[in-house]
């Protein structure tokens, strides 16, 4: 008796990954992403534009917060759709409470659902792990350090709120360029 009758638990059908193997990968990367629970709530299905004002315009862009949110969601979908073909970075910035983390989680969920590996850390968590791996030679931190550089997408939340020093600057530069 096989768990998957299609591939007979080999994980492959005609040299290609079976749906069961792909799902196992997705389950594993979700478990490693640090955001599994929150993605049940924070995803594109639950994204609401009615939170954003259509009236108040940003004097620099001339766009309302509603239009800015629409543009940001569009850019996120472009990023997701082109993820395999055009590797690039996304940077969300703005005031507290405008939806940056929510939108980041929407992107993370879509990529995780497509089998990509995504790891989420706050800036503080990221630099703490990196410093433990470098200075304390902590084995768990070293393993996580490697995952940071091997993942398909690294999400760094609240970047700019941490204490900036030469170590955090050099490590951020290393993460972004790897």
Could you describe each region identified by the protein language model?
Residues 86-103:
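Walker A/P-loop nucleotide-binding motif
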Residues 115-129:
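Short beta-strand-centered segment that lines the nucleotide-binding/catalytic pocket of NTP-utilizing
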Residues 88, 116-117, 150-153:
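Loop/turn-to-beta-strand initiation segments
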Residues 45-90:
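Pre-Walker A (pre-P-loop) alpha-helix and adjacent loop at the N terminus of AAA/AAA+ ATPase modules
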Residues 131-178:
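Conserved nucleotide-sensing/catalytic segment adjacent to the nucleotide-binding pocket
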Residues 86, 109-119:
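Post-Walker A helix-loop "phosphate-sensing" segment adjacent to the P-loop in P-loop NTPases
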Residues 2-43:
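Interdomain "pre-motor" coupling segment immediately N-terminal to P-loop NTPase/helicase cores
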């Amino acid at each position: 008796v096989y768990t998957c009758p299609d591939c007979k638990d080999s994980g492959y059908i005609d040299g290609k990954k079976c749906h069961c193997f792909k799902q196992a990968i997705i389950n594993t990367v979700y478990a490693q992403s640090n955001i599994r629970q929150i993605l049940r709530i924070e995803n594109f299905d639950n994204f609401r534009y009615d939170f954003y004002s259509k009236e108040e315009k940003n004097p620099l862009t001339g766009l309302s917060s509603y239009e800015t949110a629409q543009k940001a969601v569009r850019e996120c979908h472009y990023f997701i759709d082109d993820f395999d073909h055009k590797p690039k970075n996304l940077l969300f910035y703005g005031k507290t409470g405008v939806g940056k983390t929510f939108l980041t989680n929407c992107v993370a969920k879509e990529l995780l659902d497509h089998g990509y590996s995504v790891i989420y850390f706050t800036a503080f968590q990221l630099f703490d792990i990196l410093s433990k791996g470098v200075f304390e030679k902590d084995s768990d931190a070293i393993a996580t350090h490697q995952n940071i550089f091997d993942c398909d997408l690294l999400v760094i939340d609240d970047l700019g709120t941490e204490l900036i020093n030469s170590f955090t600057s050099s490590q951020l530069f290393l993460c972004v360029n790897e």
